[in-house]
Swiss-Prot record:
The keyword Cytoplasm applies. This is Elongation factor G. HAMAP family: EF_G_EF_2_B. One of its GO terms (cellular component) is cytoplasm. It comes from Pseudomonas savastanoi pv. phaseolicola (strain 1448A / Race 6). GO terms for molecular function: GTP binding; GTPase activity; guanosine tetraphosphate binding; translation elongation factor activity. Keywords: Cytoplasm, Elongation factor, GTP-binding, Nucleotide-binding, Protein biosynthesis. It holds the Pfam family EFG_C. GTP binds at residues 17-24, 89-93, 143-146.
Amino acid sequence: MARTTPIGRYRNIGIVAHVDAGKTTTTERVLFYTGKSHKMGEVHDGAATTDWMVQEQERGITITSAAITAFWQGSEKQHKDQYRFNVIDTPGHVDFTIEVERSLRVLDGAVVVFCGTSGVEPQSETVWRQANKYGVPRIVYVNKMDRAGANFLRVIAQIKQRLGHTPVPIQLAIGAEDNFQGQIDLMSMEAVYWNDADKGMVPRREPIPAELQELADEWRSNMVEAAAEASEELMNKYLEGEELTNEEIKAALRQRTIAGEIVLAVCGSSFKNKGVPLVLDAVIDYLPAPTDIPAIKGSDPDNEEVLMERHADDNEPFSALAFKIATDPFVGTLTFVRVYSGVLASGDGVINSVKGKKERVGRMVQMHANAREEIKEVRAGDIAALIGMKDVTTGETLCNADKPIILVRMDFPEPVISVAVEPKTKDDQEKMGIALGKLAQEDPSFRVKTDEETGQTIISGMGELHLDILVDRMRREFNVEANIGKPQVSYRERITKNCEIEGKFVRQSGGRGQFGHCWIRFAPADEGQEGLQFVNEVVGGVVPKEYIPAIQKGIEEQMKNGVVAGYPLIGLKATVFDGSYHDVDSNEMAFKVAASMATKQLAQKGGGELLEPIMAVEVVTPEDYMGDVMGDLNRRRGMILGMEDTVSGKVIRAEVPLGEMFGYATDVRSMSQGRASYSMEFKKYNTAPSHIVETVTKKQG
């Protein structure tokens, strides 16, 4: 089969935003205007096409990013051929940042939605940081311009101030709040209005209202200046007073957007059907095709040092990244992949280069929100779901077995909160194990383990809402009823002092004995190193080199169990520099035990200390309740970092230990008669005060 859409006409984009900026409504409109769904879904009715889990429809928030394929030829059919959009809708709730992170990893561009009233909110900053991390070119869409207090230029100023990026508006708003009528298109210098009769499908262009002409001229020259900075040639032309053509301006803005130098801004109201077609036009005009961005990097599975790359081209060897695993009630496991190079047909064999395992592709489907269309092949630039993968986890690479590559992996955050779960009945016991296994395969920020002492099953995740929803899914999708314990904080441990410790394990008990002996220098790890930094300085073969990996393993295993109160030890540098061995009695096991024994002594010799997770908390509250909210945060050992006034009320920023924040949602509501809202995300680990250490150590007993 030949390619139906040239790769230059592909746009792989994500719609990302803060919880209530109107992201899902915007995605719904995208589907409507691109002709994929004939009835508009409203989030308020719980009928949105992309929100397909029951929990999402009930809570009105998006939890799993659905990938949808749609086509667009321009709001006024200005393009000769259709462009193919692969759109990913992502959640904005902080407990699901992992979903946003993994979608951004496979996108080529993003539309970042802001609310015209509340502007830059805490989660917007998180999403923006993630987009920076993956270098994703983006367009800003200021939505909800029909809401009370909406102000396009104020949001633009906020983005500049709080996100450190200067947006370049290519539109201005005509009116605002109840009087929001449309946009000024700064490229064509026309006013654009929308008709209710066709649900805002086709723009109506008219001259700019006289009272807005001066403002439009000012912002047009701002846009032209941004374009002129794309090259010396354009800059000279601009400085000499020559007019730049709209084609030159467009090409220059596109070049600078893709390079990440500028962010273009548009506005509208998705709910009132005013402006989404122009957002789609901007995606075509300014966001990159897979061929416009650098080739994806990877490494040779046999030698990590050897770097490789794959270009977005059908003729290159096949490579794809699995960015999401979902369980579907009808077909079982769906593995969502982004194809970076080559072609894959159903029935083909591929290799999972991370695990070195062969997989055969059964069927392939392209998703339209919750409906699916079977396809026979996927090509470079495509996003599709594969059925029949046996052992693939999020972030792994599928590729041609003869030309293997491991694409750059994703980093997943460590969970900060844990709860014990118990099945309500004996029958649920086995079902619960299967259900938790499937959920953990889908979501890498969710972990399951068994407490060796109590035999309880412990689940860990990114926040209370995250775990609530997973337990809820267990009940609905797998029919498992479970009781949940009280949330527990995931503490960490670290050492504060440098020390040298001897680990010696000798056992003689008739026949063959055990002998392992090593000297290890321990120190806090270098800045930015979370795990174990292991160094081998053994010279002269006093410890044979085949036993060195066993020493590393012994240290790692003890780190998992901690040295102070049984919590994982982080940021440790261990240098093995001396030791001895026995010709007959030495083996890997003996050296592993010796290293583990040395590590255990760190509590005393290394100044071991307990760390607690600190959360960045933002509370938005009416001024009347500000005193109560701040007093309460102080009582929770919070540190107030600052305050600012916004349209939605006072915003209080603080850092608070997670252990003090359980049940905060209920407390802050009752304190403010339901009018305050808050968001929090993990910030860092800090030394825990002595009373916490005492309590935790006692509990661990």
